């Protein structure tokens, strides 16, 4: 009798979104009887350990990217860190070769970690960003896409967490004119939450995440405005594993982190959500059809594009961080005519992808058994 398939799941460490969107993926792998190993560190590892304490965790150093304090400085900050990023990609590739041999890995699912592919093991890249946005216009987009596809095409497959029909939730990011050569599966939006009946309690929910120092800068900006706002607020800082909380007014309930179950309850009770325009956050808000105010990270071209796309379809009210006023934003949201995408069978693409992966593993195991016989 064959042993359970051993699947390595490795999320990127830019904020918490890559880890949270791996949760429904891991759930389905476990339902299919797989033995799941997780490669991560820091906040992403802590979040997944909270949800899945039974899994096997391997330490893998993240890219540890830090953003600039200003939008204009972000491009320069990323450029300075590029040599270290390329070194990290090379290092994780070498790490994977050792890990596959040591633990008998049958397949790798990498969420935006570009060095985690292996010549002898089926390797999947999960990304919604096929078209990377730049500040250089269409020529810059095309040049970066060509370089990006060189990385993507090293994998055996690419899974895109969005609807297959354009424009989807991510617009041109996930539905570019030209696609990579590797087989592509649109998973549908990935959310750790299940649609349910809201039990509104008329508070504003603040959900923070994202790389530093921008997470802290937005937190400080919002905390400074809470006294003058005055309405009930649940403030989730997005800092799993952190001890200690800042002082806040009596009408504010502040927490460092909430697990998936508690966060779903918090979302269903909120009349309005304030968060970054991170794509994983967008998927979760659309799954629950929650009204939101989204604040793109300054200088982050992907989030700037997403903000324009979401505003165009009226999926969210998106406002810049510079000059953001909490009370005025809530008033604008009350007048905003929200619409939401039609909820489809969101797990069908994910089920297809996982079952296809397991079929390939099974075929490989049978071929190896025949060869050894």
Language-model segments: which ranges?
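A donor-sugar binding/catalytic signature common to diverse glycosyltransferases
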Residues: 263-305
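A nucleotide-sugar donor-handling region in carbohydrate enzymes
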Residues: 134-213, 237-241
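C-terminal amphipathic helix plus adjacent low-complexity
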Residues: 327-373
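Donor-nucleotide binding loops and adjacent catalytic segments primarily
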Residues: 26, 174, 188-272, 282
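A short, glycine/small-residue-rich beta-strand->loop->alpha-helix junction that serves as a flexible
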Residues: 11-23, 213-216
């Amino acid at each position: 009798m064959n042993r359970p398939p051993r699947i390595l799941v490795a999320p990127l460490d830019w904020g918490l979104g890559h880890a949270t969107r791996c949760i429904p993926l891991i759930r389905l792998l476990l339902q299919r009887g797989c033995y799941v190993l997780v490669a991560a560190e820091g906040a992403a590892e802590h979040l997944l350990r909270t949800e899945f304490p039974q899994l096997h965790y391997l330490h893998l150093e993240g890219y540890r990217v830090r953003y600039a304090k200003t939008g204009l400085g972000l491009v320069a900050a990323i450029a300075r860190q590029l040599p270290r990023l390329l070194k990290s990609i090379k290092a994780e590739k070498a790490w994977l070769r050792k890990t596959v041999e040591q633990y008998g890995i049958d397949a790798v699912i990498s969420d935006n970690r570009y060095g985690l592919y292996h010549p002898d093991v089926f390797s999947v890249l999960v990304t919604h960003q096929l078209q990377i946005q730049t500040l250089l216009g269409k020529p810059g987009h095309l040049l970066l896409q060509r370089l990006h596809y060189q990385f993507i095409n090293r994998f055996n497959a690419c899974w895109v967490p969005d609807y297959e029909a354009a424009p989807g939730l991510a617009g041109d990011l996930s539905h570019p004119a030209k696609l990579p050569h590797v087989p592509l599966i649109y998973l549908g939006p990935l959310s750790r939450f299940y649609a349910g009946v809201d039990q509104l309690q008329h508070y504003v929910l603040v959900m923070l995440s994202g790389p530093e120092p921008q997470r802290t800068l937005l937190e400080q900006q919002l905390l400074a405005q809470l006294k003058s706002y005055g309405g009930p607020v649940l403030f989730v800082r997005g800092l799993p594993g952190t001890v200690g909380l800042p002082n806040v007014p009596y009408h504010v309930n502040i927490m460092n982190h909430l697990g998936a179950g508690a966060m779903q309850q918090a979302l269903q009770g909120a009349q309005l959500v304030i968060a970054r325009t991170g794509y994983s956050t967008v998927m979760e808000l659309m799954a629950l059809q929650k009204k939101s105010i989204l604040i793109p990270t300054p200088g982050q071209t992907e989030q700037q594009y997403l903000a324009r796309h979401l505003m165009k379809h009226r999926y969210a009210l998106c406002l810049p961080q510079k000059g953001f006023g909490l009370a005025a934003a809530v008033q604008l949201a009350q007048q905003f005519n929200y619409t939401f995408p039609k909820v489809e069978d969101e797990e069908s693409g994910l089920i297809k992808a996982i079952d296809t992966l397991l079929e390939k593993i099974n075929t490989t195991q049978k071929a190896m058994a025949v060869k050894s016989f």
